[in-house]
Design a protein with these regions (language model features):
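Extreme N-terminal, non-catalytic leader segments
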Residues: 1-26
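P-loop (Walker A) phosphate-binding loop of NTP-binding proteins
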Residues: 32
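ATP-dependent small-molecule kinase phosphotransfer cores
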Residues: 57-120
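Conserved phosphate-donor/acceptor-positioning beta-strand/loop module used by diverse small-molecule
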Residues: 120-125, 134-158, 194-195
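Walker A/P-loop
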Residues: 37-38
Length: 244
């Protein structure tokens, strides 16, 4: 275990940061890749009441559809030395070590939203959401679902210029999707939302943030759809595995 991994494993959110989370309006978006998290977030951010919380990472910028990720827009790209400094100074709300890289949300990002009276919004993985929920039950967690397996597959395919490239990457994404759905369905705090229209999805999320909507029959109904999607993805994964 290297020093950075050790620092993350033993990282403790400072009390003042926990208090900040408890007294903030925070919206966390999760979902399988291709479900529409980014597009939904963009619709929400058209409303000036929301502020995008940009995570820090030590990984290098990637290219998506021929366009390179931008520092300060997609992520705050930092060096390992800077990450180590921030961890030692306890400047993160939460941090994790994934495939040799650091990912984390800084205290400063949440403070900026609070100073402007805004709702902090970010897309984050299941583990990160669990860390936030330990700090405050007021944090709103939303899991975005595609309408069904075939729609999800079609949306995902639109990202690729060749069918061969798509099929290769799609097969790799199936285990990740299975894991995310399994973990999300195991906990009670997610609002599952069926993303059949990005504008409508953003509208529903905005209602949840402002009306403190309790879980109701609709949540139960969409959870059933989530389980069906999980079954379909497992079936496809088993099919691909059997063909190898």
């Amino acid at each position: 275990m290297n020093n950075l991994e050790f620092l993350v494993k033993n990282y403790q959110t400072p009390p003042e940061a926990i208090s900040l989370v408890e007294n903030s309006r925070i919206l966390l978006l999760a979902g399988i890749s291709g479900a529409g998290k980014d597009t939904t977030k963009k619709h929400l951010l058209k409303n000036e009441e929301y502020r995008d919380i940009i995570s820090h990472t030590t990984r290098q910028p990637r290219e998506n559809n021929g366009k390179s990720e931008q520092n300060g827009v997609d992520y705050n790209f930092i060096s390992k030395e800077k990450a180590e400094e921030m961890l030692k100074k306890r400047e993160f709300i939460e941090a994790k070590f994934v495939h040799g890289k650091i990912y984390g949300t800084s205290v400063v990002e949440i403070e900026k939203a609070n100073q402007n009276g805004q709702i902090s919004v970010t897309d984050i993985d299941i583990q990160g959401i669990a860390e936030y929920k330990k700090m405050s039950e007021r944090v709103v967690a939303v899991f975005i679902l595609p309408p069904d397996f075939e729609t999800w597959r079609a949306r995902f395919a639109n990202r690729y210029s060749s069918a061969e490239e798509f099929e290769k990457d799609f097969a790799k994404r199936l285990p990740e999707a299975i894991s995310s759905l399994e973990q999300a369905l195991e906990v009670p705090y997610f609002h599952f939302i069926l993303n059949d229209d990005f504008r409508n999805t953003a509208r529903i999320i905005n209602q949840i943030m402002h009306q403190d909507i309790e879980f109701n029959y609709k949540d139960i109904e969409v959870r059933v759809r989530a389980r069906k999607l999980l079954e379909d993805i497992r079936m496809k994964f088993d099919e691909i595995s059997a063909d190898k």
